[in-house]
């Protein structure tokens, strides 16, 4: 009986040890799986990032001069489908703060920035998930068949690529460049030419395109 009990106890002890070892091995494997999964999630959640830089028509940096009061970013995924719209305030631009953009399942995104749009002078496309990048445009409003004077518009575009070699966010520069200019016209000798100083006189600039497309190029009808 003693031998039998000793044998049974040995078998039980070996069984318990084997079970403990097996459980430890499974626990280690599970930790590896969790760690690997967490790493993948962390990499997927790393956002794209841009910093806006305002430029005048001469190519000079005017970001900190306060001439840009804010901007609207239009984000398109790797298929050029509209993803989201982001409003950026003036302080973010002045301080050159990075703007994070989360666009899941896209290795590349295109960001288009518009600034200075005035609802009284221009209208911009109302974008939704059904739109693509070529649907975005800014159009001049008209008054009695004459296009309104455009506002102080800034435009920029950049394509961002996801960096798979690092887990940290890398900020990319997005330059927004002034698209309009202000000039003055003066006419001398008008009264002498007309023989009178009565009446109102105005200048009309012809052959201006009515819109700017998603690349910031003139398009549409002449106004």
Regions found by a protein language model. Give the residues of each.
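Sec-dependent bacterial lipoprotein signal peptides
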Residues: 1-24
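Bacterial Sec-dependent N-terminal signal peptides
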Residues: 19-50
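Contiguous beta-strand segments within globular domains
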Residues: 41-58, 180-184
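Residue-level recognition of well-ordered beta-strand positions that form the cores
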Residues: 51-53, 74, 114, 186-188, ...
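Structural motif
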Residues: 52-66, 186-195
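Short, low-hydrophobicity acidic/polar segments
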Residues: 56-61, 72-181
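Short beta-strand/loop motifs in extracellular/secreted proteins, especially
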Residues: 69-72, 199-201
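Short helix-loop boundary/capping segments
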Residues: 187-223
């Amino acid at each position: 009986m003693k031998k039998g009990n000793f044998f049974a106890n040995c078998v039980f002890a070996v069984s318990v040890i084997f079970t403990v070892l097996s459980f430890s091995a499974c626990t280690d494997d599970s930790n590896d799986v969790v760690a690997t999964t967490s790493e993948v999630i962390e990499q997927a959640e790393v956002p794209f990032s841009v910093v806006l830089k305002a430029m005048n028509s001469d190519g000079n940096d005017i970001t900190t001069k306060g001439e840009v009061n804010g901007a609207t970013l239009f984000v398109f995924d790797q298929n050029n489908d509209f993803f989201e719209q982001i409003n950026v305030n003036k302080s973010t631009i002045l301080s050159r703060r990075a703007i994070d953009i989360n666009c899941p399942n896209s290795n590349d995104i295109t960001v288009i920035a518009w600034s200075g749009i005035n609802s009284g002078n221009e209208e911009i496309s109302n974008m939704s998930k059904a739109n693509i990048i070529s649907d975005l445009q800014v159009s001049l409003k008209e008054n009695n068949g004459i296009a309104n004077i455009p506002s102080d518009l800034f435009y920029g575009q950049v394509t961002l690529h996801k960096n798979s070699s690092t887990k940290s966010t890398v900020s990319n520069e997005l330059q927004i460049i002034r698209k309009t200019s202000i000039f003055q016209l003066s006419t001398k000798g008008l009264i002498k030419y007309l023989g009178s100083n009565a009446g109102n006189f105005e200048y009309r600039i012809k052959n201006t395109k009515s819109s700017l497309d998603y690349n910031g190029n003139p398009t549409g009808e002449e106004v």
